[in-house]
Amino acid sequence: MSKTVVKKNESLEDALRRFKRTVSKSGTIQEVRKREFYEKPSVKRKKKSEAARKRKFK
C-alpha cells in the first residue's frame, strides 16, 4: 500500500504527482490489471514462455 503524506507548503498537485509516481514504481496498477480477470494456469504458462522468448531474442 502506497502512502503519501502532504508536506508543509506543498500543493495538492505536487503530492498527487508524488503519489502517482510511488504507485507506478511499486507496480500496483499493473498488478490490479493482471488480476482483474481469472486466467487459467495453462494460459499463464503460455504467456510466461512467450515473455521469456521475447526477452531471449531481444
Swiss-Prot record:
GO molecular function, one term: structural constituent of ribosome
Gene Ontology biological process terms in this record: translation
Cellular component GO terms, alphabetical: ribonucleoprotein complex; ribosome
Keyword Ribosomal protein appears in the UniProt entry: yes
Keyword Hydrolase in annotation: no
Keywords assigned by UniProt, alphabetized: Ribonucleoprotein, Ribosomal protein
NCBIfam families: S21p (TIGR00030)
Family in the record: Belongs to the bacterial ribosomal protein bS21 family.
Name of the protein this chain belongs to: Small ribosomal subunit protein bS21
Upper taxonomic lineage: Bacteria, Bacillati, Bacillota, Bacilli, Bacillales
Gene: rpsU
